[in-house]
């Protein structure tokens, strides 16, 4: 099960935080800082999986952004690594070559993409076509 999803830049600024487990605000801030500290110092030669507390962080770096998913230790690493890649591809298609500013200024759309792809801490949809179709339909309602 997914505990939380974070998108952070190299400076540690959080661009998206989606929580599927209840944490108080101080704990959330501490987790954000710890995840950034763990992920940013890792060499590109290392795996994209990190043991973290009683969980596991699965992350992928795209340009200057780190896409991180915290999951249970027994979950499938590769499934979540592929889910991150799928998520980035959907964002790239939806925003026509996504960049960090798209995430900042269109954060509500990014949360919509997350909600279309993940539900209650599980991967909900893996078809990029279906997700994009749903997003375009929602956009037409605006």
Curated annotation (Swiss-Prot):
One Pfam short name: Clat_adaptor_s
Name of encoding gene: AP2S1
Any one GO molecular-function label of the UniProt entry: clathrin adaptor activity
Protein name as catalogued: AP-2 complex subunit sigma
Disease per UniProt entry: Hypocalciuric hypercalcemia, familial 3: A form of hypocalciuric hypercalcemia, a disorder of mineral homeostasis that is transmitted as an autosomal dominant trait with a high degree of penetrance. It is characterized biochemically by lifelong elevation of serum calcium concentrations and is associated with inappropriately low urinary calcium excretion and a normal or mildly elevated circulating parathyroid hormone level. Hypermagnesemia is typically present. Affected individuals are usually asymptomatic and the disorder is considered benign.
Assembly and oligomerization: Adaptor protein complex 2 (AP-2) is a heterotetramer composed of two large adaptins (alpha-type subunit AP2A1 or AP2A2 and beta-type subunit AP2B1), a medium adaptin (mu-type subunit AP2M1) and a small adaptin (sigma-type subunit AP2S1). Interacts with CCDC32; the interaction is direct and mediates association of CCDC32 with adaptor protein complex 2 (AP-2).
Family statement drawn from the similarity comment of this UniProt entry: Belongs to the adaptor complexes small subunit family.
Superkingdom, taxonomy of origin: Eukaryota
CDD domains for the chain: AP2_sigma (cd14833)
GO cellular component, one term: plasma membrane
GO biological process: clathrin coat assembly; clathrin-dependent endocytosis; intracellular protein transport; postsynaptic neurotransmitter receptor internalization; regulation of endocytosis; synaptic vesicle endocytosis; vesicle-mediated transport
Primary localization: membrane
Record lineage: Eukaryota, Metazoa, Chordata, Craniata, Vertebrata
Compartments (UniProt record): Cell membrane; Membrane, Coated pit
Effect in UniProt of substituting residue 15 to H: In HHC3; there is a rightward shift in Ca(2+)concentration-response curves with the mutant compared to wild-type, indicating a decrease in the sensitivity of cells expressing CASR to extracellular calcium
Function summary: Component of the adaptor protein complex 2 (AP-2). Adaptor protein complexes function in protein transport via transport vesicles in different membrane traffic pathways. Adaptor protein complexes are vesicle coat components and appear to be involved in cargo selection and vesicle formation. AP-2 is involved in clathrin-dependent endocytosis in which cargo proteins are incorporated into vesicles surrounded by clathrin (clathrin-coated vesicles, CCVs) which are destined for fusion with the early endosome.
